[in-house]
Amino acid sequence: MSRIFARTIGLIVVALIIGEGVLRGIGIPHTLDSGWKWENSPGRKSSKYNDLTTNQLGYRGQRIHYDTDDYVVVLVGDSGLEAFAGPPEHMPEQFLLKSLSSRFTKPVKVFSLAASGWGQDQQLLAVQEYFKTYRADLVLLWPTLGNDYWENAFPDRSPTPEAGHLKPTFRLIDQELHGPYFRSGSYWHGSAVLQLAESAIAKISKETLEQRILRNWIKAMPAPHESEKQAHEGLCEGLTVIDQREFYRDIFELDPNIGYTLKSGDDFLNSRGFFSPYMSDSSERDRYLIRITQMLLKRIKEEVERHQAKFLVFHAPREEFDRRGARMVKCVSDSQGSIFRVSFDYEGLLKNIISSDDLVIIDLPWGEGNKHVVSPEDRHLNDIGNEQVMERLAVSLMERSLFDR
């Protein structure tokens, strides 16, 4: 009986190996479509400047070319650096190049590694990709502090319960980063056979493969919130209720002396949203977002320094987000009707996860109004805003004596 069992197991293993080879050979199922650069960027889809103007690595921006004596600066980020609302010649890399070149006699080159919707997980992979071929003297990372934390924790890009586009990401286990998982061109579970089986189950369940991947991923994450509707409903009573998009669109027309509850479509119960790192009563999963972001930034810094370059993170506090919005928003409600108290301090949290030696805070007198943003509905910085940030960043770098004049 034992010989028959062993022979049966052996035949199954051989069949699986043969099946794996056959499936890979005929391309069924397709490998994972994971991550994105400029060609498939969410920003490009909504931009009127959507030509495939990219560097050699596929990111929006000028071609990567430098001479031996050039001081090479690499900007790393997301939609802020991709600047999809404007032409390529008005990207932050161009403004920073102009500002640095006017201050230093040594030739300077500036290049971008950025795409809309990126967190530090895809940024880390981009930095690793860059250093396989190119060098840098300085790497500057521009975080988006309302999005990066939750983006870093999940294998998809969506703040709702519905799974978004798949992306490569990492998992934090016992304070160690593991991954990346779900790299483009790979198979889920590392197997075409297993991915085909998962796809069949997903089809029977009338869901996407991405939704199945997300559900599987979430099971291994720290504990989420229980429903906070009853716990916080009384604390948020009497606040002015307003849609989140409407709030930020009209923020300079609203009364800054009263508190607001923002209605959001985000999935705060599962820590998938703009305010998740800033919950007054945070869940284990909320705190996990912060820890994994800290570890990803640490890994990026290590990668940069391993290639003999300097690493800095810079943040330009915004009037509508860091100051006015932080004072006015007291509560948020999510897509499932749960209500949460929030208290957010972008700069304060950033200072908790980044050493002051590696952080540049760019204070600008933004004032009230929308002259520095694309539009009231789209609060990405426009050419005016980006030029001001890059000008002040250049001054800050000069003050740190990072360049020879």
Positions of predicted regions on the chain:
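N-terminal secretory targeting modules
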Residues: 1-72, 87, 133-137, 149-153, ...
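Histidine-centered active-site loop/cap adjacent to the catalytic His
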Residues: 5-7, 377-405
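Membrane/wall-proximal cationic-aromatic binding patches
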Residues: 24-104, 127, 236, 246, ...
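Conserved SGNH/GDSL esterase-like catalytic core that processes O-acyl groups on lipids
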Residues: 72-74, 80-166, 240-261
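Second-shell loop/turn segments in exported
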Residues: 80-86, 112-116, 286-290, 339, ...
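Residue-level recognition of beta-strand->loop/alpha-helix junctions
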Residues: 112-114, 315-317, 363-365
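Short, amphipathic alpha-helical "lid/cap" segments that border enzyme active or binding sites
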Residues: 120, 124, 290, 294, ...
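Serine-dependent acyl-ester chemistry module
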Residues: 146-351, 367-372
